[in-house]
Amino acid sequence: MASNSSSCPTPGGGHLNGYPVTPYAFFFPHMLGGLSPPSSLPGIQHQLPVSGYSTPSPATVETQSTSSEEIVPSPPSPPPLPRIYKPCFVCQDKSSGYHYGVSACEGCKGFFRRSIQKNMVYTCHRDKNCIINKVTRNRCQYCRLQKCFEVGMSKESVRNDRNKKKKDVPKTECSESYIVTPEVEELIEKVRKAHQETFPALCQLGKYTTNNSSEQRVSLDIDLWDKFSELSTKCIIKTVEFAKQLPGFTTLTIADQITLLKAACLDILILRICTRYTPEQDTMTFSDGLTLNRTQMHNAGFGPLTDLVFAFANQLLPLEMDDAETGLLSAICLICGDRQDLEQPDKVDKLQEPLLEALKIYVRKRRPNKPHMFPKMLMKITDLRSISAKGAERVITLKMEIPGSMPPLIQEMLENSEGMDTLGGQPGGPRTGGLGPPPGSCSPSLSPSSTRSSPATHSP
């Protein structure tokens, strides 16, 4: 026993079974076989054996381990629960997180961002109290935007986010090289030619003006309306001629050709007239040379659509589009597989693909240092559709303002492809598909197979 006591660890130092022990070994209990550290320094001598070191019993270890947090391993942490957000504050759809200050879905987040970044101006055609939910949210953009503001979405968050992205994303030069193959070059030239033959450039026109209601807005100037409706009818005919020259368009079924023309004719009309915008005089010029200022355009029939159209024309100016780009963008608007009631949407999509590729290659080759110009052009199609939808609504109110009947070809062009005549038809009624003019009319039909080119007609 005496020999064992000589190897007993002491607080001041010594040896433990032949190994030296530092004076502060009690601070590391694992070195002492699992012993707990002392609760206080003065009582250390009472807690350590004086007759020799012995291995503590399991009961002792259990007691000691429960009295010390340092040697009891903590149980593994459970995996974090998935983060659950409140439903979208705007439409009550499933939220993807907090966007611009509130819980919102991806749809409402994107709608709010686009509305603020583009300074969109919407109109409610009811009482400005439309119900907004995940089913109805796309029916009224005005009320949807108002609800975004009501639930707390912040304009400044959109602007700050945009500025941050501009700072964070370094400017990169377009490193891709775009080679125009003979096939692509041939397609571009065909579309350019089709556009130029059906829509003369502004520099080719002999501009003239009129003094009709040029200074004050009125609900409708009948003389200007008569001239505008005449030019619009000619524009529809020229749009059909343009479509017939596009590669592959006439291989579609007659029904699909008519569906595409009726869906996109107003898009193309607006795009074309906006390329003839002169910002210095704030005027637009039609194909016969008639040049109208903003007030006259309003009084000719554009009405509440006027400022939207002029704003779109201003947005086109920085793009500096030439005839090939305008023609290709018009063709992409026309040949689009997402139009309703198409018989062969997949075939339409396949016809659109080379047009998209041709526009991308042409735009990026023409502007090698502006890689974002191509997507900017494509985004204009969305703007055109928005304006065209309001244009179709404008025709309904215009029908009540004009003294006579709506020109047959304009009425046929705006017949809704879902079976509702926007000018007074009944939903679900029989569809003529625009195969011929109304009985007794001498106006040409919208049908591509029946429209004839006329050297005397010019589009707006």
From Swiss-Prot:
Tell me any Pfam family this protein matches. Hormone_recep
Q: Which residues bind DNA?
A: 88-153
Q: Does the keyword Transcription regulation apply?
A: yes
Location of region: Hinge: 154-182
**Which SUPFAM superfamilies does its entry note?**
Glucocorticoid receptor-like (DNA-binding domain) (SSF57716), Nuclear receptor ligand-binding domain (SSF48508)
Record keywords: DNA-binding, Metal-binding, Nucleus, Receptor, Transcription, Transcription regulation, Zinc, Zinc-finger
Gene Ontology MF annotations: nuclear receptor activity; RNA polymerase II cis-regulatory region sequence-specific DNA binding; zinc ion binding
Region labeled Modulating — which residues? 1-87
State where composition is biased (Low complexity): 442-460
Q: Which family does it belong to?
A: Belongs to the nuclear hormone receptor family. NR1 subfamily.
Ranges of Gly residues composition bias in the record: 425-435
| Entry keyword Repeat | no
| Function description | Receptor for retinoic acid. Retinoic acid receptors bind as heterodimers to their target response elements in response to their ligands, all-trans or 9-cis retinoic acid, and regulate gene expression in various biological processes. The RAR/RXR heterodimers bind to the retinoic acid response elements (RARE) composed of tandem 5'-AGGTCA-3' sites known as DR1-DR5. Required for hindbrain patterning and appears to be required for skin development.
A Gene Ontology term for the protein's cellular component: nucleus
Stated name of the protein: Retinoic acid receptor alpha
As annotated in Swiss-Prot or TrEMBL, what is the tissue specificity of this protein? Ubiquitous.
Which cell locations does it reside in? Answer: Nucleus
Subunit info here reads:
Heterodimer; with an RXR molecule. Binds DNA preferentially as a RAR/RXR heterodimer.
Gene of this entry? RARA
**Zn finger residue spans: NR C4-type:** 88-108, 124-148
